[in-house]
């Protein structure tokens, strides 16, 4: 009985996550459109965004109580964001489009993702990940940025504000970081 209850809770949580992602994507679309209007009539080639679906292949990331793998959630969200951006005539480069690991080791995998980002010089690079907590009451999306990047901090603020408009109960703040992960 406990197992069935946990399974149902897991399914409800996943349904909520998917619905939340849909709402977030709609709000992000509006926010991004407003931001892009301030950039002006830039050529499509100047409007490149790199989307990185974290983990992949044998690296599943976190695994939920219902067996859902972070790598799969990341790829689903990233594909949804890609569709929204492409509707706005923004060229999207994906670090991965399938369930694949980009290199043999985690370090090499991360380096390859960074290489993709550096080669295309995007206006924005976003890596999608999920966090897990032992406490059930901890929730909400949080945006991290590289601590010495003022542009990254500004972009993180715009994205975090859009996320909080969708879910006002999300009290998370943007967070600077200097570690090497995407």
Sequence positions of predicted segments:
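Catalytic-site microenvironment of enzymes
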Residues: 1-182
């Amino acid at each position: 009985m406990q197992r069935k209850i946990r399974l149902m809770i897991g399914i409800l949580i996943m349904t909520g996550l998917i619905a939340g992602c849909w709402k977030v994507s709609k709000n992000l679309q509006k926010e991004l459109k407003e931001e892009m209007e301030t950039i002006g009539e830039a050529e499509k080639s100047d409007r490149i965004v790199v989307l990185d679906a974290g983990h992949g292949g044998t690296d599943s990331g976190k695994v939920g109580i219902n067996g859902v793998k972070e790598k799969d959630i990341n790829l689903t969200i990233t594909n949804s964001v890609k569709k929204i951006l492409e509707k706005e005539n923004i060229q999207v480069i994906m670090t991965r489009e399938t369930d694949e690991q980009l290199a043999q080791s985690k370090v090499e995998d991360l380096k390859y993702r960074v290489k993709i980002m550096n080669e295309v010089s995007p206006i924005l690079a976003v890596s999608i990940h999920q966090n897990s907590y032992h406490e059930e009451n901890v929730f909400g999306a949080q945006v991290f940025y590289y601590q010495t990047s003022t542009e990254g901090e500004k972009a993180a603020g715009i994205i975090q504000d859009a996320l909080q408009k969708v879910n006002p109960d999300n009290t998370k703040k943007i967070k600077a970081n200097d570690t090497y992960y995407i």
